[in-house]
Amino acid sequence: MKLTEQQQQTLRAAVDRIIPPDDYPGAWESGVVDYLTRQFERDLRPAFADYCNGLTALNAESLARFQQNFSQLSEWNQDHVLRLVETGEVITTWEVAPHSFFDLLVRTTAEGFYSDPEQGGNRNSVSWSMVGFE
């Protein structure tokens, strides 16, 4: 199970808007996509098609609204598109309910960010350090 290059770029940008870098690394740098890639072969296998369809639709929504791929949008516009997806205010056709995809994306991003580093995310235990868990 593998994402297309476009889906990977969209995923990378989306997870970094859900958990953006600040004084600590964001979701991408913390290994969330590594976690998700591993989980697509395991627990997320049943949701893989929804993930792929959602990422493709998220990018299509960005193209329809801004004539740019999601990964190329400004952070403000990425946040705007994600808010519209969260509330279901989309103008393109989605094969998965937009709000359901948003919920899946947020939940699995948080899982990867706060998971045990042995699961592929939370690189260098960054999120645990952030919350004071040693």
Model-identified regions with their sequence ranges:
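Mature-region segments of soluble proteins
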Residues: 8-13, 17-21, 31-134
